[in-house]
Amino acid sequence: MKRHLNMLREFSIPLISGVIVALVWANISPESYQHFDHDRNFGPFSFHFIVNDFFMVLFFGIAAAEITQSCLPGGDLYPLRKAVNPLLATIGGVVGPVLVYVVLNALMGDPSLLRGWGIPTATDIALAWLVASLVFGKRHPAISFLLLLAIADDAIGLAIIALFYPDPNLPAAPQWLVLVLSGMGAAALLRRGNAQSYWPYIILGGGLSWAGLFMAHLHPALALVFIVPFLPHPHREKKHLFEEDMRDLSPLASFEHEWKVMVDFGLFLFGLANAGVTFGSIGAATWLVLASLVIGKTGGIFFMGWLGRRLGYPLPSRVGGKELALVGLIAGIGLTVALFVAGEAFTDPARQGAAKMGALMSAGCAVLALAAGRIMNVKRIT
């Protein structure tokens, strides 16, 4: 049973299932879908609010834990020189899509769509890892390169959400951010007091951080991003991303181990809450987002990875031009975070739906990457 559940997680079946159910529901009965998703059917809360502002706290908390672990000695982003080329590629993978989006939008002459520039900046780590494993094989050095890039990519994505996408309906109230600082202070004191359970950090520090972001009209989903780095952890990281060290019982590792499964399966709810757009929603924003992910990611990552090599920061062994181009194409799968940002970037339902369709259609990068891998005869290492 456990093997089958792990297979479902590995192939991102919960997220994909949620997306499919939402798409079918929204296209068969859009009124009932909107009622379920946005009306206050759960006391004072809507299903959409519960998923995006409560459940996604854990999703971004797990992302913060993975980034924190990767920055420890022995982790994938330590020391810095080891990660220079992937980090340069990350810059290309963020700047490239933004440039494509801004230039295409200028050519289209629709200033109202400019706010969506942040949608194509992040990569869906889980789906990218799955596709890369199918293209390269699980032991190919290109996998580690892609995951390093995706981790840093997500860190930038979190910063973009926090800084550039406040609630457009409510003015920011930065005075409430003192609660976020209080939460961080509480977490620091707990760590100094050697609290060896993650619960006090999450409840006290996370609770204060969530309240501060909510009252400041920012994104409470990011509450644990400010708290998780304070969780006690070993001095060295012994495993790579998606590898579990069952001997690591630190609060940081325990938080990730105990919540990652629930988060992976809970992504069904995220897909259900955010992917319900009608096929008639396809519009200018769809093609802006899709082109930015496919062209901007591929071109940006390829160019900066090539430039890094020219500057003396080598690519991993067995990663040449064709592998680098495939990594860029796979990184164009922007499903989860892109859907989240699309929901924050636009309040107009038509523009929001069109942008979300672009994020959903970016899953087609998987098909393109699999086909390109065959055509270019990429050697798989299993």
From Swiss-Prot:
Keywords for the protein's UniProt record, in alphabetical order: Antiport, Cell inner membrane, Cell membrane, Ion transport, Membrane, Sodium, Sodium transport, Transmembrane, Transmembrane helix, Transport
Cellular compartments per GO CC: plasma membrane
UniProt xrefs under Gene3D superfamilies: Na+/H+ antiporter like domain
A molecular function GO annotation: sodium:proton antiporter activity
Localization in the cell: Cell inner membrane
Keyword Metal-binding annotated: no
Record's keyword annotation contains Coiled coil: no
Topological relation to the membrane, as annotated: Multi-pass membrane protein
Pfam (any one): Na_H_antiport_1
Bilayer-crossing regions: 10-30, 45-65, 87-107, 116-136, 145-165, 170-190, 211-231, 252-272, 275-295, 326-346, 353-373
GO process annotations (BP): regulation of pH
InterPro entries reported for this sequence: Na/H_antiporter_dom_sf, NhaA
The organism's place on the tree of life at top rank: Bacteria
Catalytic reaction(s) noted: Na(+)(in) + 2 H(+)(out) = Na(+)(out) + 2 H(+)(in)
Function: Na(+)/H(+) antiporter that extrudes sodium in exchange for external protons.
Entry similarity comment: Belongs to the NhaA Na(+)/H(+) (TC 2.A.33) antiporter family.
Name of the molecule in the record: Na(+)/H(+) antiporter NhaA 1
Classification lineage: Bacteria, Pseudomonadati, Thermodesulfobacteriota, Desulfuromonadia, Desulfuromonadales
